């Protein structure tokens, strides 16, 4: 590993646990990334796409009616306003540009909720790249609007029926494909997890979320927030929000994992607080495992958080106590989803509703003037059928 230019570990987490055949591809990717980061023309093109195609900077909205406590201001970082409907577009444009720079003609991706798949499809359409998206068969069924969007933009969507037919299985299939095609294809990983250098690349291509938030906060309030709150599945929207605040020790960093039907039911997706360290998806990280070390199925009402592991930098921030990780149940997320729609006229993604749910819980407990920023990582159009079915079921 001595030829690596960047540290593949965050404390004890991370690394490059992949078949030998993929090591040259990952080293080539790291090298290209380091060069691109130092290349002004690459940065200028990336910035131009973010501004004039994706619509950055995104708004920082002070909620008018949402806060349950008059002493607490709740701001929303509006990644839901980004082209494509979620924060995913940021880093996908970065990686797609990087792939073109490396001379790759094809993109391979995995997707859970379909948001990363949609973002990948739009970037490939824009930049003239062939696009293949692996998606668990269960997710294909529960996210049909996004499947149609991907196909409409020219992507090939491949349903994965192995294992639990969800995101982790799509990840495995995508990785398998890439190991036989990396000469011509780039694997565009959708979260800040997986083997090095992906967690670092994804963080750097998402960090404008926190950078903009910091600047907007200083303009609006003349100070930094007391806490920034983001949902955590693999952890890319959260690390994008956290990265620029890590050195600002007055700002609490709070990640919210999905507690599903309740932590004690084992039907959750909260490996950071309730998993054990293991090797999965090319990295060493907290993982949902049974007593024999087999990977347990994760569960969440939101397909994008339904992931049995978490990015290595989050594991490290948790271990050193710089960030804290909480959880919110399906029911709490559903309640927050409806509350934001009714109180502010904004329909959040179910993923983002988990962060919102915890922010509301925290706001109720505050006893002094407090400013909270919730990363509203995506919009909820994709979830209206899921929520409608649940609410109708509940009302019967």
UniProtKB/Swiss-Prot annotation:
It holds the Pfam family PALP. One of its GO terms (cellular component) is cytoplasm. One of its GO terms (molecular function) is tryptophan synthase activity. Keywords: Amino-acid biosynthesis, Aromatic amino acid biosynthesis, Lyase, Pyridoxal phosphate, Tryptophan biosynthesis. Gene3D superfamilies: 3.40.50.1100. Pathway: Amino-acid biosynthesis; L-tryptophan biosynthesis; L-tryptophan from chorismate: step 5/5. It catalyses: (1S,2R)-1-C-(indol-3-yl)glycerol 3-phosphate + L-serine = D-glyceraldehyde 3-phosphate + L-tryptophan + H2O. Signal peptide: none annotated. Its cofactor is pyridoxal 5'-phosphate. Its EC number is 4.2.1.20. The modification N6-(pyridoxal phosphate)lysine is found at residue 88. The keyword rRNA processing does not apply. The keyword Lyase applies. PANTHER family: TRYPTOPHAN SYNTHASE, TRYPTOPHAN SYNTHASE-RELATED. Belongs to the TrpB family. The beta subunit is responsible for the synthesis of L-tryptophan from indole and L-serine. Tetramer of two alpha and two beta chains. This is Tryptophan synthase beta chain. It comes from Shewanella sp. (strain MR-7).
